[in-house]
Amino acid sequence: MGRGRVQLKRIENKINRQVTFSKRRAGLLKKAQEISVLCDAEVSLIVFSHKGKLFEYTSESCMEKVLERYERYSYAERQLIAPDSHINAQPNWSMEYSRLKAKIELLERNQRHYLGEDLEPMSLKDLQNLEQQLETALKHIRSRKNQLMYESLNHLQRKENEIQEENSMLTKQIKERENILRTQQTQCEQLNRNHDVPPPQPQPFQHPHPYMISHQTSPFLNLGGMYQGEDQTAMRRNNLDLTLEPIYNYLGCYAA
């Protein structure tokens, strides 16, 4: 005899209702996972208990992505069904409020999960998805950190090269300046050495003896000036008279 059809109605007994909810919830999550694996379908399931406790399953890595995709699809479908009616239609603020409230609750719950809080209601599959999300986030964080460290290292290397080039230029300029100063100092020393050479000392004048006839020409006063055409004999006679003049003076003294 076959089993009779169970009448669907609210279970009044709280304990029986909670037990039934736990069994049916586990079966529902299992069926959602089976259809996702067997049929390669994207499945998302959200269940709230009578106490407001949330249970969910998603074949994607994040429930938020599925909800955003559903919202885009629903909006596009509504646009196709009534392209002109939305212009004059009044917005349903109650539905908009409920949608935003659910989205905020979902974001807050995901944030608690990322912080390691409120993990008791999560199943093994949910924990694996959360772990995968955290690992992906850590990979992105490490990649960004390594990129910043690499950029900082390259900046420091470029700064070091610039400082080395500037140091080389300054060293070259200092050497050139030292060479110029050394050359100028050498030139100054040579000039000072040339100025320090003592001038030739004048020889003391020796008076000739009266009895000695000097072969050097004595100074004389040339009143008329000398010309190249003058008689050379007259010049020699004048020189001889001037040379013998001291002897004549001396003999004249004895004659007197």
UniProtKB/Swiss-Prot annotation:
Q: Give the keywords, sorted.
A: Activator, Coiled coil, Developmental protein, Differentiation, DNA-binding, Flowering, Nucleus, Transcription, Transcription regulation
Instruction: Note the Pfam families from the entry.
Output: K-box, SRF-TF
Presence of the UniProt keyword Disulfide bond in the record: no
What sequence ranges are listed for the domain K-box? 90-180
GO biological process, alphabetically ordered = cell differentiation; floral meristem determinacy; positive regulation of transcription by RNA polymerase II
What InterPro entries does the record point to?
MADS-box/MEF2_TF (IPR050142), MEF2-like_N (IPR033896), TF_Kbox (IPR002487), TF_MADSbox (IPR002100), TF_MADSbox_sf (IPR036879)
Q: What is its main location?
A: nucleus
Write out the GO MF terms.
DNA-binding transcription factor activity; protein dimerization activity; RNA polymerase II transcription regulatory region sequence-specific DNA binding
Which compartments does it reside in?
Nucleus
Q: Where's the MADS-box domain?
A: 1-61
Which GO terms of the cellular component aspect does the record hold? nucleus
The source's superkingdom equals Eukaryota
Q: How does it assemble?
A: Homodimer capable of binding to CArG-box sequences.
Which purpose does this protein serve, as stated in its record?
Probable transcription factor that promotes early floral meristem identity in synergy with APETALA1, FRUITFULL and LEAFY. Is required subsequently for the transition of an inflorescence meristem into a floral meristem. Seems to be partially redundant to the function of APETALA1.
- Protein name in UniProt: Transcription factor CAULIFLOWER
Give the organism the record lists. Arabidopsis lyrata subsp. lyrata (Lyre-leaved rock-cress)
Q: Which gene is annotated as encoding this protein in its UniProt record?
A: CAL
